Amino acid sequence: MTSQSQGIHQLLQAEKRAKDKLEEAKKRKGKRLKQAKEEAMVEIDQYRMQRDKEFRLKQSKIMGSQNNLSDEIEEQTLGKIQELNGHYNKYMESVMNQLLSMVCDMKPEIHVNYRATN
């Protein structure tokens, strides 16, 4: 019977060692998963910062070009207004004279379709 109890005792010890090894492997696996998760988070943060930097750079280029465009449009508008004011001042006198002469200087004429009934 002692040999049987020794065999059972050896089996229990082997089972305990296997259980300890499994627990140790689970702990190592958990530690590796935690480390991998931390590394992934660091990598994600770095990637996010890189993409944010690229986005801000592109945004500043676009916004800068929009500011340049708005300044250019403002300059063109002011130039056009000055040009129109110049034309107004230049031609105002002659246009008013033509308009007044058309209204005031009437030349009475008989219409071409008028027929004398006499």
Swiss-Prot record:
GO cellular component: cytosol; plasma membrane; synaptic vesicle membrane; vacuolar proton-transporting V-type ATPase, V1 domain
Family per similarity comment: Belongs to the V-ATPase G subunit family.
Coiled coil: 5-54
UniProt keyword terms in alphabetical order: Coiled coil, Hydrogen ion transport, Ion transport, Transport
Protein name as annotated: V-type proton ATPase subunit G 3
Region (Disordered): 1-34
Function, as annotated: Subunit of the V1 complex of vacuolar(H+)-ATPase (V-ATPase), a multisubunit enzyme composed of a peripheral complex (V1) that hydrolyzes ATP and a membrane integral complex (V0) that translocates protons. V-ATPase is responsible for acidifying and maintaining the pH of intracellular compartments and in some cell types, is targeted to the plasma membrane, where it is responsible for acidifying the extracellular environment.
Tissue specificity field: Kidney.
Gene Ontology molecular function: any one: ATP hydrolysis activity
Description of how the protein assembles with itself and partners: V-ATPase is a heteromultimeric enzyme made up of two complexes: the ATP-hydrolytic V1 complex and the proton translocation V0 complex. The V1 complex consists of three catalytic AB heterodimers that form a heterohexamer, three peripheral stalks each consisting of EG heterodimers, one central rotor including subunits D and F, and the regulatory subunits C and H. The proton translocation complex V0 consists of the proton transport subunit a, a ring of proteolipid subunits c9c'', rotary subunit d, subunits e and f, and the accessory subunits ATP6AP1/Ac45 and ATP6AP2/PRR.
Organism listed in the record: Homo sapiens
InterPro entries per record: V-ATPase_G
UniProt keyword Acyltransferase, yes or no: no
